[in-house]
């Protein structure tokens, strides 16, 4: 079963027709009255990145991928929360320092600020990022129509190439 099938079958009814949840199929939560836009993404080692030898590259990939959910909606990200699970081999002082340095560079580049998170010791390496922005309007995925223009930044396929490189 694919992601959208799982969401539709098991979770969409839980949103209780909350219009802000966008039927759980548009990558973000959007509360128009509060101008609040929120996105959450989880990244698992061996699925979303294959090597943690260069934590800087992994952090760049996952943070940029997460905030892109807001950016593609026309929303400027403002805050993010990051949670990580790992063990003594992945959460070494060296790696934690690299993660911190990379987050600092990305914050400066995109004008975003860390606002919280969590760390858990586990044999599985993973990260979850919640991105938060504010806007009175967003671009809805499900409102795309035939003959709409599509704009792409960078090269198509770069995401896949970076995945096999990491």
Segments predicted by a language model, with ranges:
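Conserved small/polar residues in nucleotide/adenosyl-binding loops
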Residues: 164-166
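N-terminal glycine-rich phosphate/pyrophosphate-binding loops that anchor nucleotide-derived ligands
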Residues: 1-71, 134-136, 148-149
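Glycine-rich anion-binding loops of enzyme active sites
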Residues: 43, 76-162
């Amino acid at each position: 079963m694919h992601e959208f099938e799982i969401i539709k079958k098991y979770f969409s009814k839980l949103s209780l027709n909350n219009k802000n949840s966008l039927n759980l199929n548009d990558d973000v939560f959007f509360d128009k009255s509060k101008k609040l836009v929120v996105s959450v993404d989880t990244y698992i080692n061996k699925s979303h990145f294959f090597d943690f030898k260069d934590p800087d590259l992994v952090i760049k990939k996952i943070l940029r991928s997460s905030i892109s959910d807001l950016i593609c909606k026309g929303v400027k990200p403002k805050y993010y929360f990051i949670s990580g699970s790992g063990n003594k081999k992945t959460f070494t002082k060296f790696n934690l320092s690299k993660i911190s340095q990379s987050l600092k560079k990305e914050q400066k580049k995109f004008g975003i600020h860390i606002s919280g998170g969590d760390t858990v010791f586990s044999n599985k390496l993973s990260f979850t990022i919640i991105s938060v922005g504010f806007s009175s309007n967003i671009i809805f995925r499900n409102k795309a129509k035939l003959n709409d223009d599509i704009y792409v930044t960078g090269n198509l396929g770069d995401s896949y190439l970076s995945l096999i490189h990491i």
